[in-house]
């Protein structure tokens, strides 16, 4: 099969299926200079006269790059990426009290924001109540203070949790905050199986890059795999972890090291879940990632593409995952 054959097959299957579900936002996409941006570019073998001249198979091209929406997802997990749907837009926000942060969230949603991203203060991040002496001077400083279910109710007052997705940047006490969130949603009358959002829940990068851990590694990993198991059965649309390279890069790593350490952490989480008795395809589709977007554009593009391909191959070949959703590296 030639590269052209592969390209046409992609258009007739993967792309068509995607467009049948989500039409592109407009008929023509252009740069600021008015130059049309093609849906997909492939090598031109006919001196500028287009891809129809390609008649020789290029297995290396297909195996390494392929087409968006298909294994190994080097060029993206969605066939049209953001030509059909925008990413969820949410400003990282949270400060002072739950009541004050709630006002901010409702304002942001009224301005067109399509999701919420909760910033917690340091006492909350390391499991201290606001009235603990060690928390003095830090309550509500770099995020919102949450000590109780009442605080969580105030945080999401008048915000229907079954209609908005919520990202919570919380790690060591992630299970507690997620339980509070689900409880508030239930009190609102929501079905927890329909809830959408993300908890960061990446304790390994806290040990090496950031520092807001509470427990030793082994029990911390147990908490994380318990969350994997619970959510796979009860909250299937929730991203149970955001495996983070961002903080590793900010702590001084290179782009290559960022990908290496992040994927190593991802492998550790998958291995822990398998050791706990979970089936890989039951939880892998709920794993997400968080990478840095640094200054060198081409290096960052290459980093993202390499990470997608490596993760897809790790999940399919090393862990024998069968579902395409288990192979896809979804990140922000």
Which stretches of residues belong to each language-model region?
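Extended amphipathic alpha-helical segments enriched in small hydrophobics
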Residues: 300-308
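Catalytic alpha/beta active-site cores
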Residues: 1-294, 299-300, 318-332
């Amino acid at each position: 099969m030639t590269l052209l054959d592969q390209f046409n097959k992609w258009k007739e299957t993967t792309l068509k299926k995607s467009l049948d579900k989500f039409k592109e936002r407009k008929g023509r996409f252009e740069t600021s200079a008015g130059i049309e941006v093609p849906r997909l570019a492939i090598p031109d073998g006919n001196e500028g006269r287009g891809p129809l001249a390609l008649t020789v198979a290029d297995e290396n091209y297909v195996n390494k790059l392929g087409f968006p929406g298909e294994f190994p997802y080097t060029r993206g997990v969605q066939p049209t990426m953001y030509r059909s749907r925008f990413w969820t837009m949410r400003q990282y926000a949270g400060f002072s009290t739950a009541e004050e942060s709630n006002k901010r969230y409702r304002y942001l949603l009224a301005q067109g924001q399509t999701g919420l991203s909760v910033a917690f203060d340091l006492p909350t991040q390391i499991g201290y109540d606001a009235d603990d002496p060690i928390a003095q001077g830090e309550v509500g400083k770099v995020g919102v203070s949450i000590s109780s279910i009442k605080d969580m109710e105030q945080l999401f007052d008048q915000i229907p949790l079954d209609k908005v997705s919520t990202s919570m940047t919380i790690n060591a006490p992630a299970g507690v905050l997620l339980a509070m969130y689900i409880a508030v949603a239930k009190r609102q009358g929501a079905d927890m199986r329909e809830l959408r959002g993300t908890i960061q829940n990446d304790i390994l990068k806290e040990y090496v890059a950031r520092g807001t851990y509470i427990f030793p590694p082994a029990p911390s990993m147990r908490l994380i795999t318990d969350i994997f198991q619970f959510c796979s059965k009860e909250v299937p649309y929730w991203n149970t972890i955001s495996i983070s390279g961002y903080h590793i890069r900010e702590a001084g790593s290179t782009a290559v090291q960022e990908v290496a350490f992040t994927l190593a952490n991802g492998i550790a989480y998958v291995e822990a879940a398998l050791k706990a008795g979970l089936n890989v395809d039951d939880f892998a589709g709920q794993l997400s990632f968080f990478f840095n977007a640094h200054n060198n554009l081409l290096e960052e593009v290459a980093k993202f593409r390499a990470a997608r391909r490596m993760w897809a191959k790790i999940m399919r070949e090393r862990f024998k995952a069968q579902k395409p959703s288990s192979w896809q590296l979804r990140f922000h």
